């Protein structure tokens, strides 16, 4: 079996044990074959692998929770599960994806890239808030894909709820077209009955016009009520209206405290109101007569019954005479209502003031309680200090008398120092105020004192020092900019160097490309072999056809005589011998190829066994290494 060349390493011999790492690929001086380049990078890649595995499990759980149960199939690859789940989520969110995922598994890298681009286009149409690139999908970057799949599952659930509501409404509407629920039927009957009742009430009690106003008369609310026969109800006042009037006058006199002025104002208002009402009644009487002259008796009977017409004529005939007294009664009642409203407003205002006073009292009460609590705490503290001093005095003995005296002297010294510190602070503050005043006085002096030669020399020195410092600052800024440029160049160079995770991705990508190229090479060889086989078959069929044509053309001539027949038979024997030789060669070649195929199959099975054994031994070795690390850790803890 021809060994495939590696695209990663220069030395591809079987005894080279460093083909698993990327030392010769990276060309770094600190990395040597057979050793790990950097322990921190190894730990980082291991942490990334653990986190990626955890995110992969969470993605599968999210897809199953969302309803994509195909992710439970253990025979599918992670790419098919994750990308299939993403496509299913996008389709379930009512967004189309131009890809066929359900009948094509284990795609090559070109199909994966095209599929990833279609998914990214669909996510952009959905306005996904998370950035995504095609390499994240093809290389299965689970850490980047996890928030996107979580967002897609939430979209699926929202779309499912919306479609569920729409389907529920549609089913209810379709049911309502052919059937009616018992509750709806009872409600419809009661609604129809109530509507009929309301219509009958509206028809019975609707307002009807009973009189007509003159055209040259100005429209007022009172005249409009009179047209519809509503004003006559105002005349039906209770018999005790005088009593109410007297009570209102008494209440007004008690509130105002001015009997004479209140009465005069009320009498004047009453007289004015009586005059206005009399004038309006006279106009309405003329309008009534005019209306009676224009409206016929039959039309009026159609509006009102005969008894109602008689009563109205009697009432409105006497209204001109009784209009002043009734108007005064109405005015008194109106004034009474106004006084009541004013009293209610005054009561409401006083209540608000009372609430404000109560709130202020409660605030003062809380402040008083806080002060009482503070005083109680101070008193308790003083009592505790007194008790402690009494205890200390009781504990005083001839042995510790000197120590207590020394302690008392130290306490007194501390208190005196504190008092001196306060006095010193106060004196410093006073001096600071005095110095500030002096400085202000000096600054407010004449400008001639500022033009002294010494001050000018000092200003020149300060200016020179300032200029020199500015020059130094510029030089330092130039050096800093140069250092920043160097740092940025080094940083850019370091950024261009691939990390171990990127190198692992590159290696995986190169391996996939190598596998794809080898599969294409195998496929091309199969095409060539098939073509050669068909070409040989075509040649044999052409030879057979030519032989059959020659036999057919010479058969009649050969059968004409015995000599020709013998020659014909000999030529046929030669042809058969040639065909037999070709057949023998083909059989020998087929046998050789079969033996080679069997040998290669045996070698392949042997290699598969070795691979299984290698993976098993590697796993056992890792387990033993882990146990060894645990034992070393425990040993270190015991030491």
Swiss-Prot record:
Record keywords, A-Z: Coiled coil
Keyword Coiled coil: yes
GO biological process, one term: Golgi to plasma membrane transport
Signal sequence segment: none
Matches recorded under InterPro entries: CCDC93, CCDC93_CC, CCDC93_N
Annotated family: Belongs to the CCDC93 family.
UniProt name for this protein: Coiled-coil domain-containing protein 93 homolog
Lineage: Eukaryota, Amoebozoa, Evosea, Eumycetozoa, Dictyostelia
């Amino acid at each position: 079996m021809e060994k495939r060349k590696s695209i990663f390493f220069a030395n591809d011999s079987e005894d080279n044990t460093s083909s698993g790492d990327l030392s010769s690929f990276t060309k770094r001086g600190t990395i040597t074959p057979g050793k790990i380049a950097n322990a921190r990078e190894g730990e980082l890649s291991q942490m990334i692998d653990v986190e990626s595995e955890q995110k992969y499990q969470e993605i599968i759980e999210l897809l199953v929770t969302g309803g994509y149960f195909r992710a439970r199939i253990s025979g599918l690859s992670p790419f098919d599960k994750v990308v299939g789940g993403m496509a299913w989520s996008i389709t379930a969110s009512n967004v189309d994806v131009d890809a066929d995922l359900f009948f094509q598994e284990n795609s090559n890298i070109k199909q994966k890239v095209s599929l990833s681009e279609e998914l990214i286009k669909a996510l952009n149409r959905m306005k996904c808030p998370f950035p995504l690139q095609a390499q994240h999908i093809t290389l299965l970057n689970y850490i980047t894909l996890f928030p996107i799949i979580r967002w897609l599952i939430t979209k699926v659930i929202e779309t499912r709820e919306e479609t569920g509501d729409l389907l529920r409404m549609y089913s209810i509407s379709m049911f309502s077209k052919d059937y009616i629920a018992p509750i709806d039927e009872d409600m419809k009957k009661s609604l129809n009955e109530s509507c009929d009742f309301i219509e009958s009430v509206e028809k019975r009690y609707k307002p009807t016009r009973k009189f007509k106003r003159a055209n040259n008369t100005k429209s007022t609310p009172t005249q409009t009520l009179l047209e519809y026969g509503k004003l006559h109800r105002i005349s039906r006042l209770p018999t005790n209206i005088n009593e109410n009037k007297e009570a209102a006058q008494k209440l007004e006199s008690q509130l105002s405290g001015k009997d004479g002025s209140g009465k005069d104002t009320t009498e004047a208002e009453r007289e004015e109101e009586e005059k206005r009402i009399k004038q309006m009644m006279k106009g309405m009487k003329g309008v009534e007569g005019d209306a009676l002259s224009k409206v016929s008796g039959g039309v009026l009977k159609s509006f009102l019954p005969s008894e109602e017409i008689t009563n109205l004529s009697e009432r409105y005939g006497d209204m001109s005479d009784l209009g002043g007294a009734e108007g005064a009664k109405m005015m008194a009642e109106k004034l009474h209502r106004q006084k009541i409203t004013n009293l209610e407003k005054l009561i409401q205002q006083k209540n608000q003031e009372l609430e404000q006073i109560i709130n202020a009292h409660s605030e003062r009460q809380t402040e008083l309680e806080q002060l009482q609590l503070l005083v109680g705490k101070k008193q308790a503290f003083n009592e505790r200090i007194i008790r402690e001093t009494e205890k200390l005095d009781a504990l005083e003995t001839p042995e510790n008398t000197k120590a207590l005296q020394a302690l008392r002297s130290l306490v007194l010294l501390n208190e005196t120092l504190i008092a001196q510190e306060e006095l010193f602070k106060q004196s410093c503050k006073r001096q600071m105020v005095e110095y500030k005043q002096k400085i202000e006085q000096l600054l407010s002096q004449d400008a001639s004192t500022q033009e002294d030669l010494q001050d000018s020399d000092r200003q020149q020195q300060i200016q020179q020092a300032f200029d020199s410092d500015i020059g130094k600052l510029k030089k330092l800024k130039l050096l800093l900019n140069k250092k920043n440029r160097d740092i940025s160049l080094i940083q850019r160079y370091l950024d261009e160097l691939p990390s171990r995770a990127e190198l692992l991705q590159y290696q995986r990508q190169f391996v996939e490309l190598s596998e794809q190229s080898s599969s294409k090479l195998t496929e091309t060889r199969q095409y060539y072999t098939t073509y050669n086989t068909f070409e040989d078959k075509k040649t044999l069929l052409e030879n057979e056809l030519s032989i059959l044509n020659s036999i057919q053309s010479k058969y009649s001539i050969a059968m004409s005589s015995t000599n020709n027949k013998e020659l014909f038979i000999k030529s046929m024997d030669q042809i058969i011998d040639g065909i037999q030789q070709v057949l023998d060669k083909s059989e020998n070649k087929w046998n050789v190829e079969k033996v080679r195929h069997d040998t290669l199959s045996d070698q392949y099975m042997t290699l598969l066994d070795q691979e299984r054994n290698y993976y098993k031994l590697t796993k056992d070795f890792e387990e033993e290494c882990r146990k060894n690390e645990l034992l070393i850790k425990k040993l270190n803890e015991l030491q």
